[in-house]
Design a protein with these regions (language model features):
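Short acidic, S/G/P-rich loop/turn micro-motifs used as interaction or catalytic elements
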Residues: 19-23, 69-73, 102
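A short, well-structured beta->alpha microelement
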Residues: 37-57
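Eukaryotic N-terminal targeting leaders
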Residues: 1-11, 120-123
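Ser/Thr/Gly-rich flexible loops in soluble cytosolic domains mediating phosphotransfer, phosphorylation
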Residues: 84-123
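Short, charged N-terminal beta->alpha structural module
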Residues: 8-40
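Short glycine-rich or small-residue beta-strand-to-loop segments that form or flank ligand, phosphate
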Residues: 12-14, 62-68, 98
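Mid-chain, well-packed structural core segment of small domains
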Residues: 56, 60-92
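Conserved strand-to-helix beginnings and helix N-cap segments that scaffold or border functional pockets
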Residues: 24-27, 75-76, 107-108
């Protein structure tokens, strides 16, 4: 069976990151590393909290990741906005990176952290 067939249905991902190039690069690494288990399509990045509602409404993502530059309170606000836009029962899965992870431990730590938590998030 080809790897793509084993990966299951695609998950549409929206990231919320003020550095869109970095988001694309790091998520690209996760997508590549996990492609035998999951099909993840990075549909969009949102660079500002004020843009979350419009992008989530347009993209209707399955996954929403908030980056480590957001405080826990900001990440909660982003998640609440996203869930408030989607229809009841949509089943949006969210993941917030710990604040400061990128700055303190670098991009490899971000990729590792996502890859460690993705299986339980998608279970």
């Amino acid at each position: 069976m080809p790897a793509a067939a084993a990966a299951g249905p695609p998950y549409k991902l929206v990231t919320v990151n003020t550095a869109p190039e970095r988001a694309a690069r790091l998520i690209g690494r996760v997508v590549e590393d996990m492609k035998d288990r999951y099909t993840i399509v990075h549909a969009a990045n949102v660079a500002a909290i004020e843009e979350v509602e419009a992008v989530v409404r347009e993209q209707q993502p399955d996954l929403l990741f908030t980056a480590s530059m957001w405080t826990p309170e900001e990440a909660q606000k982003i998640v609440a906005i996203a869930k408030g836009v989607l229809p009841v029962g949509h089943g949006l899965k969210t993941f917030s990176l710990p604040q400061g992870l990128q700055v303190e431990r670098g991009p490899d730590a971000v990729v590792e952290h996502i890859e460690e938590h993705l299986p339980s998030l998608l279970a």
